[in-house]
């Protein structure tokens, strides 16, 4: 079983408009509301793929109830209730653009943070892999992912971390290392303080930096150009075919789902990398974020090339 952790989930609201007019009324006909957050995208894709998955995180208020009530019944909801209201994130789609209005989310108390920590320990009993995705809510220290990874490691669980900024830096500089991290080139550049390109030799060199010591897998997203990956001392380039993209939103989360599935099923390097990229591409072919159409899986799987470099 796979456990997905979304500490700062949201309700994602989409407002499509022909034109966004400022300082006046804009009327929306077609409103879409879905449970949002990187980890929730991961769990939905895992569910589509047929994996047994349970989802946790911190939720509160009517917005939190909405999230629980609008996840598929086959996903085991094991969320931790907090006093604050789960945030709402609004995307206004207009004239080919997307304007986002993102709430910060609730402020967690020390007691709530401690409560979730104990809740997390309990949830580890019957899982093999844990995914940790997205931003930390207000009140949680930057090293909180480091704490959860340490607990998972003590219990023999594999972890996949997909975050950025201070939270990622705290993990890399801490003692407890995740099994997998999945930065993109922009995030890698921020970590290293220099601009990174798709040059394989340069990527090889930086992924051997002491900053990444102790991390079994480093999987760097190159967008439409696939993936560059390091597993222990072996490097891979994953070449993906060109596809018609409907929406790339959530494709990174779908890739995390594939990584977690590969780890849970003890797949070899090539199978894990291929599955992860296929699920990311399948999500990009869908309008709905965090959804994959498995009818196209086999065809895409055969078109991906994994090369040791």
Curated annotation (Swiss-Prot):
Protein origin, superkingdom: Bacteria
Molecular functions per Gene Ontology: ATP binding; phosphofructokinase activity; tagatose-6-phosphate kinase activity
The enzyme's E.C. designation: 2.7.1.144
GO terms of biological process kind: D-tagatose 6-phosphate catabolic process; lactose catabolic process via tagatose-6-phosphate
Alphabetical keyword list: ATP-binding, Kinase, Lactose metabolism, Nucleotide-binding, Transferase
One term under GO cellular component: cytosol
InterPro entries with a match to the protein in the record: LacC, PfkB_dom, Ribokinase-like, Tagatose/fructose_Pkinase
Pathway assigned in UniProt: Carbohydrate metabolism; D-tagatose 6-phosphate degradation; D-glyceraldehyde 3-phosphate and glycerone phosphate from D-tagatose 6-phosphate: step 1/2
CDD domains the record matches: FruK_PfkB_like
SUPFAM superfamilies tied to this protein: Ribokinase-like
Pfam families: PfkB
Annotated Gene3D superfamilies: 3.40.1190.20
Catalytic activity from the UniProt record: D-tagatofuranose 6-phosphate + ATP = D-tagatofuranose 1,6-bisphosphate + ADP + H(+)
UniProt cross-references to NCBIfam families, sorted A to Z: 1-PFK, lacC, PRK13508.1
Family according to the record: Belongs to the carbohydrate kinase PfkB family. LacC subfamily.
HAMAP family: LacC
Protein name: Tagatose-6-phosphate kinase
């Amino acid at each position: 079983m796979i456990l997905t952790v979304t500490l700062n989930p949201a309700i994602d609201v989409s407002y499509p408009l022909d034109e966004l007019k400022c300082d006046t009324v804009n009327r929306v006909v077609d409103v879409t509301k879905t449970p949002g957050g990187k980890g929730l995208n991961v769990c939905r894709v895992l569910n589509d793929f047929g994996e047994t998955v349970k989802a946790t995180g911190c939720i509160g208020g009517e917005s939190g109830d909405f999230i629980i009530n609008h996840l598929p019944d086959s996903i085991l909801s094991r969320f931790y209730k907090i006093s604050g209201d789960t945030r709402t994130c609004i995307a206004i789609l207009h004239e080919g653009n997307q304007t986002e209005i993102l709430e910060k989310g609730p402020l967690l108390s020390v007691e709530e943070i401690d409560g979730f920590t104990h809740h997390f320990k309990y949830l580890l009993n019957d899982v093999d892999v844990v995914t940790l995705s997205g931003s930390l809510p207000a009140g949680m220290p930057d090293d909180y992912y480091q704490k959860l990874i340490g607990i998972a490691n003590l219990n023999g669980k594999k972890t996949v971390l997909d975050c950025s900024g201070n939270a990622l830096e705290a993990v890399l500089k801490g003692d407890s290392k995740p099994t997998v991290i999945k930065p993109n080139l922009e995030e890698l550049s921020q970590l290293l303080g220099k601009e990174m390109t798709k040059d394989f030799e340069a990527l090889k060199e930086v992924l051997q930096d002491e900053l990444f010591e102790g991390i079994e897998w480093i999987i760097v997203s190159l967008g439409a150009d696939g993936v560059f990956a390091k597993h222990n001392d072996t490097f891979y380039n994953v070449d993906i075919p060109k596809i018609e993209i409907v929406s790339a939103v959530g494709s990174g989360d779908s890739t995390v789902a594939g990584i977690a599935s590969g780890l849970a099923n003890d797949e070899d390097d090539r199978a894990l990398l291929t599955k992860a990229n296929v699920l990311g591409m399948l999500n990009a072919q869908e309008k709905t974020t965090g959804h994959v159409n498995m009818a196209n899986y086999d065809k895409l799987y055969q078109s991906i090339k994994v090369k040791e470099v």
